[in-house]
């Protein structure tokens, strides 16, 4: 066999080219050349959790087709050949897979040989074979061979006979009480619990705050009330169907393996008993042939058969005096249709939800919160656990309570967090946003939603996804101290979520909780701490039985337990105060940083201004470097002082000259007047005239001095005159020194134009 040999195969009725790689088969569809991306990631030797994250972040964001039903090897996420080549190249397996990617069958040429050691049966063929085998069995009896090929639910008193059938992939097969319609392989993944009839009366409406006491239960520490999925046989792990989206079934954890007797959960040999969590993870957990039985007043669940009616499972509100109200009747009719939809095969396709289910009757509270199964689940519980967002929103508008509780105190948020449906449909963030007000609610054992998620272990993809969503979204609407309280919440046995992770040896969840504020020193009722459990300080028997021996590692034990209780209560407050101090310091530090940045910007602006001034100064002084600026400025200052002294001297000389001219002119006038009056006699009147003239002369001389000073000021302070000269020079292209000589010409020109 050549290492590059391409084979032909047929899986679930689809023709493919198959390439045998050391890690498994790599497939390419013949019809459209699409390649299974999950196979490529397997060829790159990624573990399943890593493959799931890569598919989420890098593959399903582009063109893809997800195949979950049919033959196991064919399942996975299929992408076009071009995207497959890029994906293989990114993870360095392109050269290994190139024979398959480059292979093209020439028209008219022979098809590649069939893949060896494979049976390529289509899905329809396998279904027909199962139907044939089932038809050969008498009614009410199923052979061991048939039961090994059909995964249908039966009550727990029917025992499976081991060793009668070959080992199958997936969950253990179960015997079947009655022959039912054959269903495809993809619809027979989950075990189907039998559904007992209900005897709920109007006086048994679920209370929002039921009285759950510590003495009301006798279950062992940290025992998780398992769903039908969690009740699978422990030797079966989660199904490895390529992309990790099929199932979250896992064996019971260490802390959940010890179950004490409980009257509510007790199984009898004569009566079928429902699981402790009747809500299935998919509608296929119900047999289509099993209808709902008529209502009975018996408190013991009855086995249903195919002849019972559908509507009678719904508990109807009745009274011996008054008939059912119109709201009650409308609610019962709607819930009957809703239950029919939940147990049908159409729940995976939200685009085909009947419109009548999206428009429930209004104003039907509290009837819309009627229990629809013996474990007191409401329709809202079902819708949230199924991950069907449109129905969740419709029920919410109709008045459904987000705090409805089942008989073990589980809210719809907890129910949606313990099944994988919200993960498969990617509706958990939206449903959590609707139910976020109940994130702090506890069940009958004081466990919150984080307890329930962590107990499922991190190898379950949906559990990792749910915990990431919860821890990220609660930061958007609640203060940190409440988050710390939620993460360190202790159940009735004193176990925090970190105890669960430590007991399961779940390093991923353990580290994630530590990063979000979980405390390693919290003691449970047996005195065990998460740190001691994860470090192997306690034996397995101690952890399982809730007992412990003397611990040599702990020297300072705090007794009585009230001291530890007070410490545990104070720790979140201390943490909150420290975080407030840190926030205050951070705010002050940020304020100082902003001030420093502002000062740096101011200094930078000033430096820029200084540089600009220096450049202009160098240009004005006709210099190349700033080193000589001080010398040049000193020289210019000395010249200015010298010029100012010369101006003052010239000013005095000019004043003296003007004074001398004025004195000579006055003397001339005086001499002329003196000659005219010589020889004339003067009387008293003329003497008075002379005095008046002298006074007038004095005033005129004073005015003359003022005018003289004004002339000097105009001549010496000529800054405005220089500006005018410069403005005229720029407007007429005449040199500044020639402006005075051209003033008459300019004036005449302007007068003519005016």
UniProtKB/Swiss-Prot annotation:
Domain HTH APSES-type: 6-112
DNA-binding region: 37-58
Keywords per UniProt: Activator, ANK repeat, DNA-binding, Nucleus, Repeat, Transcription, Transcription regulation
ANK repeats (start-end): 375-404, 493-522
Entries under PROSITE patterns matching the protein: ANK_REP_REGION (PS50297), ANK_REPEAT (PS50088), HTH_APSES (PS51299)
InterPro entries per record: Ankyrin_rpt, Ankyrin_rpt-contain_sf, HTH_APSES_sf, KilA/APSES_HTH, SWI6-like, Tscrpt_reg_HTH_APSES-type
Family annotation (SMART domains): ANK (SM00248), KilA-N (SM01252)
UniProt feature, compositional bias: Basic and acidic residues: 257-272
Region (Disordered) residue spans: 105-215, 239-301
Primary site of residence: nucleus
Subcellular location: Nucleus
Pfam families, per database record: Ank, KilA-N
Amino acid composition bias (Low complexity), ranges on this chain: 147-162, 273-289
Polar residues: compositionally biased ranges: 177-187, 203-215, 290-301
GO CC aspect terms: MBF transcription complex; SBF transcription complex
GO molecular function: DNA binding; DNA-binding transcription activator activity, RNA polymerase II-specific
Function noted in UniProt: Binds to MCB elements (Mlu I cell cycle box) found in the promoter of most DNA synthesis genes. Transcriptional activation by MBF has an important role in the transition from G1 to S phase. It may have a dual role in that it behaves as an activator of transcription at the G1-S boundary and as a repressor during other stages of the cell cycle.
Subunit organization: MBF contains SWI6 and MBP1.
Name of the protein in question: Transcription factor MBP1
Organism: Kluyveromyces lactis (strain ATCC 8585 / CBS 2359 / DSM 70799 / NBRC 1267 / NRRL Y-1140 / WM37)
Gene (name only): MBP1
């Amino acid at each position: 066999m050549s290492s590059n040999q391409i084979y032909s195969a047929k899986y679930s009725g689809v023709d493919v080219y198959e390439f045998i790689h050391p890690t498994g088969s790599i497939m390419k569809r013949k019809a459209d050349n699409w390649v299974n991306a999950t196979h490529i990631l397997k060829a790159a030797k990624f573990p399943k959790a890593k493959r799931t994250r890569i598919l989420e972040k890098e593959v399903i964001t582009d063109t893809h087709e997800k195949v979950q039903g049919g033959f196991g090897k064919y399942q996975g996420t299929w992408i076009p050949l071009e995207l497959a080549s890029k994906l293989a190249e990114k993870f360095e397996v392109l050269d290994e897979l190139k024979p398959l990617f480059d292979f093209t069958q020439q028209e008219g040429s022979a098809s590649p040989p069939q893949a060896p050691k494979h049976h390529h049966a289509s899905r329809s063929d396998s279904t027909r074979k199962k139907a044939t085998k089932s038809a050969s069995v008498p009614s009410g009896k199923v052979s061991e061979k048939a039961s090994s090929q059909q995964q249908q639910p039966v009550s727990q008193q029917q025992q499976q006979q081991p060793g009668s059938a070959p080992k199958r992939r997936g969950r253990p097969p179960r015997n079947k009480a009655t022959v039912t319609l054959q269903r495809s392989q993809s619809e027979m993944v989950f075990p189907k619990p039998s559904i007992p009839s209900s005897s709920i009366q109007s006086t048994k409406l679920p209370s929002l705050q039921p009285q759950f006491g510590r003495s009301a239960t006798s279950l062992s520490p940290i025992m998780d009330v398992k769903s039908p999925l969690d009740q699978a046989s422990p030797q079966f792990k989660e199904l490895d169907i390529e992309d990790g989206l099929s199932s979250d079934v896992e064996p019971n954890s260490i802390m959940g393996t010890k179950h004490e007797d409980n009257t509510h959960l007790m199984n009898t040999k004569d009566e079928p008993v429902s699981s402790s969590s009747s809500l299935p993870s998919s509608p296929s957990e119900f047999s289509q042939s099993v209808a709902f039985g008529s209502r009975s007043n018996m408190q013991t669940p009855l086995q249903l058969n195919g002849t019972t009616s559908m509507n009678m499972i719904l508990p109807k509100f009745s009274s011996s005096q008054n008939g059912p109200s119109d709201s009650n009747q409308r609610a019962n009719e709607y819930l009957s249709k809703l239950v029919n939809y939940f147990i049908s095969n159409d729940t995976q396709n939200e685009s085909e939800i009947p419109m009548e289910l999206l428009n429930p009757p209004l104003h039907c509270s509290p009837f819309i919160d009627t229990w629809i199964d013996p474990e007191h689940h409401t329709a809202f519980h079902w819708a949230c656990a199924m991950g069907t967002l449109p129905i969740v929103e419709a029920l919410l508008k109709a008045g459904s309570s987000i705090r409805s509780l089942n008989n073990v105190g589980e809210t719809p948020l907890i129910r949606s967090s313990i099944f994988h449906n919200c993960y498969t449909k990617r509706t958990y963030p939206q449903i959590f946003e609707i139910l976020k007000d109940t994130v702090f609610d506890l069940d009958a054992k004081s466990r919150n939603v984080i307890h329930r998620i962590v107990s499922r272990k991190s190898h379950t993809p949906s559990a990792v996804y749910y915990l990431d969503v919860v821890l990220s979204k609660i930061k958007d609407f609640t203060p940190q101290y409440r988050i710390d309280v939620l993460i360190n919440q202790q159940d009735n046995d004193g176990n925090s979520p970190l105890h669960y992770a430590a007991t399961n040896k779940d390093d991923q969840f353990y580290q994630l909780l530590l990063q979000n504020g979980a405390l390693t020193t919290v003691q449970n009722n047996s005195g065990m701490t998460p740190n001691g459990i994860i470090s192997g300080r306690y034996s397995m028997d101690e952890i399982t039985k809730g007992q412990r021996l003397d611990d040599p590692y702990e020297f300072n034990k705090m007794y009585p337990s009230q001291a530890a209780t007070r410490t545990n209560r104070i720790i979140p407050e201390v943490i909150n105060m420290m975080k407030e101090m840190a926030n205050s310091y951070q705010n002050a530090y940020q304020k100082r940083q902003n001030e420093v940045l502002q000062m740096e910007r101011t200094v930078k602006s000033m430096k820029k201004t200084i540089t600009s001034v220096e450049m202009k100064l160098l240009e004005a002084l006709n210099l190349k470097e700033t080193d000589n600026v001080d010398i040049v400025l000193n020289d210019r200052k000395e010249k200015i002082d010298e010029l100012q002294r010369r101006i003052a001297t010239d000013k005095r000389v000019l004043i003296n000259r003007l004074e001398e001219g004025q004195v000579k002119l006055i003397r001339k006038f005086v001499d002329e007047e003196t000659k005219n009056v010589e020889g004339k006699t003067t009387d008293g009147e003329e003497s008075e005239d002379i005095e008046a003239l002298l006074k007038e002369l004095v005033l005129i001389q004073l005015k003359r001095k003022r005018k003289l000073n004004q002339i000097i000021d105009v001549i010496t302070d000529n800054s405005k005159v220089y500006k005018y000269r410069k403005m005229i020079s720029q407007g007429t292209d005449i040199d500044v020194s020639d402006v005075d000589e051209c003033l008459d010409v300019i004036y005449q020109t302007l007068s003519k134009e005016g």
